[in-house]
Amino acid sequence: DTAPTGHTLLLLDATQSYHKEVARSQGEIPAAVEKLLPHLRDPQYTDVVIVTLAEMTPVHEASRLAEDLDRAGILHKWWVINSSLAATNTTNKLLKARAQNEVRWINQVAKISQDNFVVIKWHPEEIKGATLSNLFTE
């Protein structure tokens, strides 16, 4: 989980700039800082999964995050659409209308992610741990 779109990369960049300044003034960069961005860029070390809701603003924000990651050379492949009403097959009129509105954004994520996405249906309770990982096999 990260800061809003773009802020994460700015924080990484600011951290790197800070440590470059420390290195300039003191002569050394901590190993953890030197390894951070290379680790984030290494698909053998890091998997980046973009998580969004099937709504306009979250999809646009996630799309901008994907663009920022591309610019930073950080690979990302999978997207998760979380808490989808469209995946619940609800019969409630209000929820059904909201579910129909999600379809456009699910299709947008399908396009952006080149069909590398999963949809997790809305659950009334918070899902954690092993239960969460089981949702990906449903």
Located regions from the model:
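Phosphate/Mg2+-binding loops and adjacent switch elements
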Residues: 2-57, 61-64
